[in-house]
From Swiss-Prot:
The gene is dnaK. Transmembrane segments: none annotated. Belongs to the heat shock protein 70 family. Residues 605-627 are annotated as: Disordered. GO terms for molecular function: ATP binding; ATP-dependent protein folding chaperone; unfolded protein binding. Coiled coil: none annotated. The modification Phosphothreonine is found at T200. The lineage of its organism: Bacteria, Pseudomonadati, Pseudomonadota, Gammaproteobacteria, Lysobacterales. Acts as a chaperone. The keyword Phosphoprotein applies. This is Chaperone protein DnaK. Induction: By stress conditions e.g. heat shock. It comes from the Bacteria.
Length: 641
């Protein structure tokens, strides 16, 4: 059995970790970084860029550079959160045939958010494979604790498209608690994990206890907001900069995708700088132009102004903390430690708000960017049997149930129930002689069914005719360790049963997933060919440069026929490099190498010939010297002078 890797698939950045010698180790990517931007770009020439390389070219390719797609995964296009996002991103978001939110490139290619996320997961997979020197096929992937069933299913689908068997989906705060608490001694403790990442917010109250020599991590309660994160903080800064520029220049930069992408980068940089300084300057020369000429943006931003812009967002994160504590039956004073996770928690205003609410300073010894991936790797180690004596008891974040008469939401499994779990409830018919019932499965907390998230609808038919209220239909809910739901309905009299694994009511069909898997495989082959072509071109380019240098240095020493052959080989290779035929480039590179060797050989021979002539002259001089007789001379004085 190979390694089960741990992946934190983040909104802004992703991270991969493995268990290595009993310790979790975060693996550096090919650029030498421990985290990878969750950004995917499609270039004009068909290349797919992932991570830092995609981020670097975002300003010049905004409509084909996709970031923060985690906020779209498993969502309907009509969701309020998706509609809000449309005005903040330069790329296209549109409705797929099933109502899901998909993204679109500038040449109208449509893709599911799962496909974009799969590209990031592939990069994480490759990072682990390069380090381990072996294939990786299994992973534990983290999701926000407050992700619903559709979003969890969609994340598993992304893993499948990336060629990964997702052994477990675990909640990000729970993973962070594993990373924090695995090696900690000192008895039972209750911790709060406040996880404010790039696009989502979670808080979990977790009890860490020693039970019969086993370390038990039990989630007591969880809450959150899957559309609150660093992206929203960035957007507040962008809106402020756009408004200030509009006041000054009368130009609305929201209509310019290129300017919007530059503003996004600048806003993120300014926000980060203001975590360690009191003031920064956003300076974007040539941000746009009008009839009067180019326009430059230069705006000072203070920490106080930033805090005023995002104050309501920070407050918005505190209410779920209050709810989670209440659900756990605890007070803030009962919490022993507060752990901060997610890059946005580096903001002093956020740290202060958390300290004020819990009445204690959050711990600073947990890396907010890496803790979640480390926890995922530990869970992978538990599943593989490499990590012993650890038990993880997670919960379902939202209540699950069905719609009953009058549009009422009847809960079958309450929120914060430890998973895996099963629960059943018996219902009956609403009309006389009803032969079928429709089971409408929902997730949420509202009393009215229509305000909750619809997960699935299915029919149980073949019920024997009887007066209303007589038939007994047992509806059973079964949540697995990934937090994914299976539902069955059974007529107790006839034992007829209908089972369904909840596929995100929207979501991808098996056929779509298979197509995307095949597409990813084809792209992997295409990417491999592309990189081989680039390597061949780079090698050829280096040889051309070296050969031209050799001609400059040695051309005067060799005959014209040798130089002619080298020049011809150079010209042939340069022509080949304009095309995409790798075999031709390699063949002509070899020809130039051989021509270059003949140039060096001719130059060396010419130099040796020169040396031989010099040696012959020296020999003659030596012989002449040998004929001279040594003599003593006596000075004769001329007295006649």
């Amino acid at each position: 059995m190979g390694k089960i890797i741990g992946i934190d698939l983040g909104t802004t950045n992703s991270c991969v970790s493995i268990m290595d010698g009993g310790k979790a180790r975060v693996i550096e990517n090919s650029e030498g970084d421990r985290t990878t931007p969750s950004i995917v770009a499609y270039t004009k020439d068909g290349e797919v860029l992932v991570g830092a390389s995609a981020k670097r070219q975002a300003v010049t390719n905004p409509k084909n550079t996709f970031y923060a797609v985690k906020r779209l995964i498993g969502r309907k296009f009509t969701d309020a959160e998706v509609q809000k996002d449309i005005s903040h991103v330069p790329y296209g978001i549109l409705a797929h045939d099933n109502g899901d939110a998909w993204v679109q490139t500038s040449d109208a290619k449509r893709m599911a958010p799962q496909e974009i996320s799969a590209r990031v997961l592939e990069k994480m997979k490759k990072t682990a494979e390069d380090y381990l020197g072996e294939k990786v096929t299994e992973a534990v992937i983290t999701v926000p604790a407050y992700f619903n069933d559709s979003q969890r299913q969609a994340t598993k689908d992304a893993g499948r498209i990336a060629g990964l068997d997702v052994k477990r989906i675990i909640n990000e705060p729970t993973a962070a608690a594993l990373a924090y608490g695995l090696d900690k001694k000192g008895g039972d403790r209750k911790i709060a994990v406040y996880d404010l990442g790039g696009g989502t917010f979670d808080v979990s109250i977790i009890e860490i206890a020693e039970v019969d020599g086993e370390k038990q991590f039990e989630v007591l309660a969880t809450n959150g907001d899957t559309f609150l994160g660093g992206e929203d903080f960035d957007n507040r800064v962008i809106e402020y900069l756009v408004d200030e520029f509009n006041k000054d220049q009368g130009i609305d930069l929201r209509k310019d995708p290129l300017a919007l992408q530059r503003l996004k980068d600048a806003a993120e940089r300014a926000k980060i700088e203001l975590s360690s300084s009191q003031q920064t300057e956003v300076n974007l020369p040539y941000v746009t132009a009008d009839a009067s000429g180019p326009k430059h943006l230069n705006i000072k931003l203070t920490r106080a102004k930033l805090e005023a812009l995002v104050e309501d967002l920070v407050k918005k994160s505190i209410e779920p903390c209050r709810t989670a504590l209440n659900d756990a039956g605890l007070r803030a004073s009962d919490i022993n430690e507060v752990i901060l996770v997610g890059g946005q928690t580096r903001m002093p205003k956020v740290q202060q708000a958390v300290a004020d609410f819990f009445g204690k300073e959050p711990r600073k010894d947990v890396n907010p960017d890496e803790a979640v991936a480390v926890g995922a790797a530990i869970q992978g180690g538990v599943l593989a049997g490499d990590v012993k004596d650890v038990l993880l008891l997670d919960v379902t974040p939202l209540s699950l149930g069905i719609e009953t008469m009058g549009g009422v939401f009847t809960k079958i499994i309450e929120k914060n129930t430890t998973i895996p779990t099963k629960a059943s409830q018996t219902f009956s018919t609403a009309e006389d002689n009803q032969s079928a019932v429709t089971v409408h499965v929902l997730q949420g907390e509202r009393e009215q069914a229509r305000f909750n998230k619809s997960l699935a609808k299915f029919d149980l038919s073949g019920i024997e005719p009887a007066p209303r209220g007589m038939p007994q239909v047992e509806v059973s809910f079964d949540i697995d360790a990934n937090g994914i739901l299976h539902v069955s309905a059974k007529d107790k009299k006839t034992n007829k049963e209908q089972k369904v694994e909840i596929k995100a009511g929207s979501g991808l069909s098996d056929e779509e997933i298979q197509r995307m898997v095949a597409d990813a495989e084809a792209n992997r082959e295409e990417d491999k060919k592309f990189h081989e072509l680039v390597q061949a071109r780079n090698q050829a380019d280096g040889l051309i440069h070296a050969t031209r240098t050799a001609i400059t240095e040695h051309g005067s020493k060799v005959g014209g026929d040798v130089i002619g052959k080298v020049e011809a080989a150079l010209s042939d290779l340069e022509t080949a490099m304009k095309g995409d035929d790798k075999a031709q480039i390699e063949a002509r590179t070899k020809t130039l190498e051989e021509a270059g060797q003949s140039l060096y050989a001719a130059a060396a021979a010419a130099e040796q010939g020169g040396s031989a002539d010099a040696a012959s002259g020296n020999a003659q001089a030596s012989k002449a010297a040998d004929d001279v007789v040594d003599a003593e001379f006596t000075e004769v004085k001329d007295d006649k002078k």
